[in-house]
């Protein structure tokens, strides 16, 4: 799901309810982001995708709301207004996201 404004970010998180949600931020001008985008597309759960060039305000809102440094590419697992897991650059791998999601889901 493309997240292109703060309203769609709020809706994506709200619709997840108590289920952890995956957010992926990327740059459409970065080679690392392109590789990681292909990797994240293998994740079996829905992913909220933010293209920073088109939605910088959303990226800024994520940094503010979750008190996390802005990076691209960056994957987050959130629940409500809490970050349960995050990774950036080459650490963003489909398997790592799936394993983190399983781990945080067990811990709830």
Where are the predicted features?
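Short, well-ordered alpha-helical microsegments
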Residues: 32-33, 59, 94
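Non-catalytic, surface beta->alpha helical segment in thiol-disulfide oxidoreductase systems
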Residues: 79-108
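Structural micro-motif
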Residues: 66-79
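A structural signal for the main folded, soluble domain(s) of proteins
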Residues: 9, 34-38, 84-92
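Thiol-based oxidoreductase modules, predominantly thioredoxin-like and allied folds used
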Residues: 25, 45-61
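Local sequence-structure signature of Cys/Sec-based thiol-disulfide redox active-site neighborhoods
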Residues: 11-43
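N-terminal leader/targeting and pre-domain segments
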Residues: 1-17, 106-108
């Amino acid at each position: 799901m493309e997240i292109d404004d703060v309203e769609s970010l709020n809706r994506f998180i709200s619709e997840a309810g108590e289920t952890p949600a995956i957010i992926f931020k990327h740059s459409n001008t970065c080679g690392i982001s392109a590789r990681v985008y292909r990797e994240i597309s293998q994740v079996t759960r829905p992913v909220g995708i933010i293209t920073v060039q088109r939605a910088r305000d959303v990226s800024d809102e994520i940094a503010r709301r979750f008190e996390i440094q802005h990076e691209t590419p960056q994957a987050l697992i959130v629940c409500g207004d809490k970050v349960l897991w995050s990774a950036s650059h080459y650490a963003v791998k489909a398997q790592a996201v799936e394993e983190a999601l399983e781990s945080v889901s067990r811990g709830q």
